[in-house]
Amino acid sequence: DTPMASGQPLRLMSNAVNRITVNGNLVGPTQRISAERALRSVTIDAAYSLRKEDEVGSIVPGKLANFTVLTENPLTVSPQSIESIEIWGTVHEGRVLPIP
């Protein structure tokens, strides 16, 4: 199998929310989804597809504390800005690792 989409979660979110091609064309506007739904798709739903939803995919007690820290909230920025949100750092197994 070959991946059919980018492995970049913010790009995946942006594509799902905006439905704009790299050439700027709108494709399937009726298939747009909300930023909230897109965020679930790249977090808990992705974990579910790997059968790891009990370990990762959401920030709750008992799960691994592995997640990306963003400089802006993808749920509150304009849909067109989602893909350009910068990564501040990560948290891996509870350890905060800012990008230098």
Which residues does each predicted region cover?
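His/Asp/Glu-enriched, well-ordered alpha-helical/loop segment
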Residues: 1-76, 80, 85-93
